[in-house]
Design a protein with these regions (language model features):
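A general structural motif
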Residues: 1-3, 60, 93, 106-107
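Short catalytic/ligand-binding loop motif for oxyanion handling, primarily in non-cytosolic enzymes
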Residues: 13-16, 63, 72-76, 104-106, ...
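Short, flexible loop segments at the rims of nucleotide/cofactor-binding pockets, characterized by
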Residues: 39-43, 87-90
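Substrate-recognition element of Asp-dependent hydrolases with the DxDx(T/V) motif
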Residues: 42-43, 48-79, 84
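Conserved Lys-Pro-Asp/Glu-containing loop-to-beta segment of HAD-superfamily phosphomonoesterases
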Residues: 95-117
Length: 117
């Protein structure tokens, strides 16, 4: 069995664009991700949802969403979980892992926007 971990921010959802948008609208807030509702409102990256769905259809693959929480927004745990349910359905929430230390998990592949994750 192949285990694949997929990051959320800037892999499944467009985190950077939302940060830029918030900074443009609210330049006095240095941490846009601290705003309640920020993570829930993220748009999917083009093609990301379809690609994740194709991976889940493979019989020899286990797919998990592995994402770090925001230290600036304690609601990020709930908002990220709700985002996954909205985009992939309730069952996929069982494959959501929210962890600050991604290197602690054992798997075959990590799809992440940060090389050092």
């Amino acid at each position: 069995m192949l285990t694949i971990y997929i990051d959320m921010d800037d892999v499944l959802c467009d985190y950077s664009s939302k940060i830029k948008e918030h900074k443009h609208k609210n330049p006095d807030n240095p941490f846009p991700q601290s705003v309640p509702g920020f993570f829930r409102s993220l748009e999917p990256m083009d093609g990301a949802l379809a690609a994740e769905e194709q991976l889940r259809k493979k019989t020899n693959v286990e797919v998990y969403i592995l994402t770090a929480p925001s230290t600036k927004n304690p609601l990020s745990y709930t908002e990220k979980r709700l985002w996954v349910e909205d985009k992939f359905g309730y069952e996929m929430t069982h494959n959501l892992i929210i962890c600050s230390h991604k290197g602690l998990l054992k798997g075959n592949i990590l799809i992440d926007d940060h090389a050092s994750a």
